[in-house]
Amino acid sequence: MPEQIHARVEACYQQAEAFFKQRFARPEISFKLRGQKAGVAHLTENKLRFNLQLYRANQEDFLRQTVPHEVAHMVAHQLFGPRIQPHGEEWQLIMRGVYELPPHRCHSYEVER
């Protein structure tokens, strides 16, 4: 299953590279994330973490929305620097312009407690 996430991350980077006409450094990908968060972008470490439990329960939406959401954070950081807002206009530009997705801040997955 993580192979699908790896493939989607790569596809998102390729979309961003075609859109912006520049290369982006690929992040380390980890699946050590639990709890309510579906994904986290560690910008200064160039690392993406994904929640496999939420992925397994929401595969289609996770690949369509969550993975691009996190990649958009990485791309925005590489393009615009560290002083931008996490879900600010730069990130929203990438979500809408590159991925043609609504810039939702949070997922609506059911989370077990």
Regions found by a protein language model. Name each.
Residues 1-65, 74-113:
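Active-site-proximal or metal-binding-adjacent scaffold patches in catalytic folds
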Residues 70:
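Walker B catalytic acidic pair
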